[in-house]
Amino acid sequence: MAEDPYEVGRGVSRAFWADSVADAIEARDPDEPIVIKGGVSPSGVPHIGHFNEIMRGYYVAEALRDRGHEVRQVFTADDKDRLRAVPRQLADLDWNVVGLGEVDAGALGRNLGKPYTDIPDPFGCCDSYGAHFTALLQKSAELVGVDVEFVSNTELYADGEFEAVTRRVLERADRARDVLAEYQNKVDDDYVPFLPQCAECGKITEGVTAVDLDAGEVEYVCEDVEAGDQTIDGCGHEGTATLRDGKLPWRFEWPAQWEILGVDFEPFGKDHAEGSWPSGEDVAENVLDIQPPVPMVYEWFTLDGEPLSSSSGNVITVDEVLDILEPEVFKYFFVKDPRKQRDFSVENIDQLVDEFDRFERRYFEEIEASEDDAELAERAYPMVVDDPREQRIRIPYTFAAVLGMTDDPALREQIARKEGHIPDDAPEWAVEQALARVERAQEWASLTNNEFNYELKRAEIPEVSFDDATAAALDELADFIAEGHDGEAIQSEIYETAKRNDIDISEFFSAGYRLLFDDTEGPQLGTFIAKLDREFVVERFRRNE
């Protein structure tokens, strides 16, 4: 009996869950290389939910490598699976997401029921539909700097890797039926655990009528197949298929992969924990006579409070994430306890960045930390950041968003230095990396249209005019700013100046925003003004430039 997937990674003596998983793997004294596996059907645009499995495996692999083990991290593209439904959205290899109207959706519909690797790539750039979406997932791993070996199920079948285990399952068909009946309704006495591919129409069918293991063949009729709430029509062809011309059903294919690849550990979502894992464990032990790998359940993510769903379009890709986050911040997100459901909130992404920055400072012992937090930083940080360097600078994310209001690189650096976020002795590489966060924060502000989504009109003053009272009040405020007050004092003085000149406060704020942004709204004015070059602000409020 394998370990409880809900308990693996829960070791109380370890601050980092990946170390607890590594303990469980080592306890089995596995052969080397230790194999860590994940997998997914390349059914459509891969998102951060699919990436969960890669990252959980990555951290366990790194924990084992730290202990001197040789580790192979593989990820199977379950690309011999049939296309069950036409997706709502697709993406090209540059991550441009398109609707079905921009590709030949009819071709996809005509290929329902066929393996992903037998369906033409809608964009015409890869060998197949399956190859296209596997390539996107592989690119995701490369973007984050995670080295994963991708394995095609279709190729494993074609190369005969599945043949021996498929034969064994069919030899033990009675035993396979008894096991499956524990987890699935309506397992008929004539059920055969093999899905041939029709030689006529190319669809994966279920209508096996006879098995000849001496010849290594099955006879079949291409029947209709239920796929969710729809039926995929069979063509009625009667034929013969070899054990390479088809596939095992999922509940048998998954444990077969464990045997073929020699898998020692596999993480999976809670949907599998309550369905596929118990049956897979049973099949492994009682049909294949192998030991299942060490399992671990991870919780799903939500996106801005809603379930990730490709069908509903509520997804975010790794490429989109890296438009607003450094790769190391995204990797840090997966350091967190996998057993807790977490929300990936784009709107509040600044909080995740701030949390990462504190995590980094704990590693360099720049801030106090609890014993567990200090141990977690010590263990995980070198896995998150490829090149730990104490001189690295992190500009606070929301401040970086403020800097993003101007496109002037020199001004960005000037303001950051003025506010103390870039030390005088900072090396050039550290300054360059620190300011690179500005572009991401600027993209975040634009994406969420938040309070930082404004453009400072520095080059020339917007075309604005004010009545005499407002003009006089702006001159008074300019004099106050020239005295060198901080943001809080300036914010307070804005109210006082409006009051002295009998001006509506909202209109006075609008006057300031119009001068700076050519807009009637903006960030907290006093705080923002204090971050800018004082001479520029004074001259702008005096309408001199």
Swiss-Prot record:
Keywords: Aminoacyl-tRNA synthetase, ATP-binding, Cytoplasm, Ligase, Nucleotide-binding, Protein biosynthesis. InterPro entries: aa-tRNA-synth_I_codon-bd_sub2, aa-tRNA-synth_I_CS, aa_tRNA-synth_I_cd-bd_sf, Lys-tRNA-ligase, Lys-tRNA-ligase_SC_fold, Rossmann-like_a/b/a_fold. A motif ('HIGH' region) lies at residues 42-50. It comes from the Archaea. Its EC number is 6.1.1.6. Its main location: cytoplasm. GO terms for molecular function: ATP binding; lysine-tRNA ligase activity; tRNA binding. It catalyses: tRNA(Lys) + L-lysine + ATP = L-lysyl-tRNA(Lys) + AMP + diphosphate. One of its GO terms (biological process) is lysyl-tRNA aminoacylation. One of its GO terms (cellular component) is cytoplasm. A motif ('KMSKS' region) lies at residues 307-311. It is found in: Cytoplasm. NCBIfam families: lysS_arch. Belongs to the class-I aminoacyl-tRNA synthetase family. This is Lysine--tRNA ligase.
